[in-house]
Amino acid sequence: MSTGEGTAEQTATGTPAQNGRESIPSDAIREEYENLSDLIRKYRFAYYQDDAPLVSDAEFDTLFRRLEEIEALHPELVANDSPTQEVGGEASAAFAAVEHLQRMYSLEDVFSIEELEAWLNRAEASIAKLGDGTAQAAWLTELKIDGLAVNLLYRDGKLVRAATRGDGTTGEDITHNVLTIKEIPQQLSGEGYPSEVEVRGEVFIPSKAFAEFNEALIEAGKAPLANPRNAAAGSLRQKDPAETAKRPLKMFVHGIGAREGLEARSQSETYALLKEWGLPVSPYFEVLEARADVLGFISKYGEQRHKLLHEIDGIVIKVDDFATQRALGYTTRVPRWAVAYKYPPEEVHTKLLDIQVNVGRTGRVTPFGMMEPVKVAGSTVEMATLHNQDVVKAKGVKIGDIVVLRKAGDVIPEIVGPVLALRDQQDPPVRDFVMPTECPACGTPLAPAKEGDVDIRCPNGKSCPSQLRERVFHLAGRGGFDIEALGWEAAIALTQPAEPDVPPLTSEAALFDLTREDLADVKIRREKRSKGVATGEYELVPYFYSKGTAKSPSKPTASTEKLFKELDKAKSQPLWRVLVALSIRHVGPRASRALAQAFGTMDGIRAASEEELAHVDGVGPTIAAALKEWFAEDWHREIVDRWAAAGVRMEDERDESTPRTLEGLTVVVTGSLPNFSRDEAKEAILVRGGKASGSVSKNTSYVVAGESAGTKLDKAEQLGIRVLDEDGFRLLLDGGPAAVGDAAEADGGDAPEESAALQEEKAAAVEETA
């Protein structure tokens, strides 16, 4: 997946440049922004945590770039939890979480030679301003391996830990599995290695080895693996290292993170040292000074990409000199000294067999294409979203068409359009897609939520099984109750099983009342496989219980037992997670935290007036109205009441001993603080009544700047906003504005009141829990 697969070394932070003319976002823009944020988080989770992409790189990149475009025009929408402010995915709960000594960054992506040249122009202009104005760059140019980013930690030459990248700050401890990869030395060789060093690289499965491994799986009657990247990621997440050892994994290292006592001056010099220490370094890199040579490198490997040792999804271009890298610095997500060029997407032709629709958790109806399975860019694709009926019309596709399917960036499927020259040759003849007028799941008439909406929705939130399935899947997510055993297939089994006729759940209200006996007879339809290959035939299989025999009676599976343990654990989740789990439109993690902080109890939130809700910083009128509308429904209140009766915690334990020193203040933290992680700093602000913002504006009270602070610090200085270091931040936390010499802020005299319009804009920055 793009916008996050490459890694970068060194440390610093900043914020993306905000370009374009600012204006108040319309309701349509706000809704588009919320939907985009929701989709991108969903697709990232599937890619990084499940190793099972739901969409192609092309579609993901398009969605991500549109999100960046909206944020550039409306910077007030940017929140700390925006996908543009995050790196990759979170650490999985299945492995111990470990913090990297130095953050692992993403890379900025460009998708054409024109975009690359524009990036090079900007970088070269910045480099020319350094020193005496005559500096020039040498570019280390290398292949972008399509694998899993891994961080190796060596102490005194001994490998002591290996971790996935995770969110860039915290990854998963996969040391035991990495030890099975023969190319990775457990003890560095040679001399001169640092007493402590993080080595970054990419674990992958060579293309030929992947094909041979899949052939062996099929011969053994097992399902083949989807593609080398997902296979490598899945191999490193095996609970049994012996299983990992069976996979043909390799690794190439491409940089370093934290280190003690290393005097390397450049990326290429570091590669030479890594090789001397016995680490596997890719042979596919060159240090180039002329731009024409960089473009020649791209052209050369573009022609050879399917003949290489491993799959690639682009070319990485880095400034070779470390001093120049440090001078150029970082944004919050990417280095300014490196870029990933993505090759034009591979395209294939396949038949569009049907266009079906899916009903989401807020009733939104989305068409998607079902195609003859076809292999493109290393994986088999048979589905691709078509977003809405207007997109279907704009693409001009008809059911039965031969269509152009591509994977831009080499990883999410996109239907580009029909092959018109073949349309008249199709048998049976092609036919138009007609958007249904009734919900395919419950039969309720469909309609736009309001006049002029492109999307149509099913208004039957209470009884629509598709909406219930999607809500149950959502509430179990990492932002909600975090129930790992309640995945997509389990949500289907609970809400839409093949048997019995009445599902275990007809409302999420009953979730915490489930018993093992309720699940004993549940069966789902699962496709039969022959030697690992799908047959197109289906059978009914028990989902929550094992198949019983005369000698071994049916009993709950290990996954079922895990589900009940996690349901019990979920009851003690904090209030904000319960709010997220309720699928209230517009109420995402940011608003939920603000509401929990302001009211402390679910009863307090329910009883609050719309005006009181809107007054909460980070909520505003849109979210306040959505809350009142949601609680006005009897069946919604029943969910809360039954969860509470089952023991779900509906209030937060409030530490009254923590002084509310930041009441009414907005604080922005930028750069690296020695004694606070970003989350710790945010939590310290919130518990003292302040707002932890991700962007600097005239309404910002203070900016806390750590090492390598970026453009947020520049903007604070331009606006005349007080800037504090970590010591000043501690004083502010303990004693409020007066402790740092700001009497006016302490009195509240100069604090501007927020207009209704400003609160409305804040509401739009919250992801739609839809």
From Swiss-Prot:
Keyword set, alphabetical order: DNA damage, DNA repair, DNA replication, Ligase, Magnesium, Manganese, Metal-binding, NAD, Zinc
Gene3D superfamilies cross-referenced by the UniProt entry: 5' to 3' exonuclease, C-terminal subdomain, 6.20.10.30, BRCT domain, DNA ligase/mRNA capping enzyme, Helix hairpin bin, Nucleic acid-binding proteins
Record's GO cellular component terms: cytosol
Record-listed NAD(+) binding positions: 57-61, 106-107, 142, 165, 202, 318, 342
UniProt keyword annotation of Manganese present: yes
Keyword Manganese recorded: yes
Disordered, as annotated region: 1-27, 741-770
One GO molecular-function entry: metal ion binding
Domain of life, per lineage: Bacteria
Residue ranges, compositional bias (Basic and acidic residues): 759-770
Residue span(s) of domain BRCT: 657-746
GO terms classed as biological process: DNA repair; DNA replication
Catalytic activity entry: NAD(+) + (deoxyribonucleotide)n-3'-hydroxyl + 5'-phospho-(deoxyribonucleotide)m = (deoxyribonucleotide)n+m + AMP + beta-nicotinamide D-nucleotide
EC number: 6.5.1.2
Compositionally biased intervals (Low complexity): 1-18
Residues at the catalytic site: 144
Compositional bias (Acidic residues): 744-753
PANTHER family, A to Z: CHROMOSOME TRANSMISSION FIDELITY FACTOR 18 (PTHR23389), DNA LIGASE (PTHR23389:SF9)
Function: DNA ligase that catalyzes the formation of phosphodiester linkages between 5'-phosphoryl and 3'-hydroxyl groups in double-stranded DNA using NAD as a coenzyme and as the energy source for the reaction. It is essential for DNA replication and repair of damaged DNA.
Similarity section: Belongs to the NAD-dependent DNA ligase family. LigA subfamily.
Identification of the protein by name: DNA ligase 1
Organism: Pseudarthrobacter chlorophenolicus (strain ATCC 700700 / DSM 12829 / CIP 107037 / JCM 12360 / KCTC 9906 / NCIMB 13794 / A6) (Arthrobacter chlorophenolicus)
Gene: ligA1
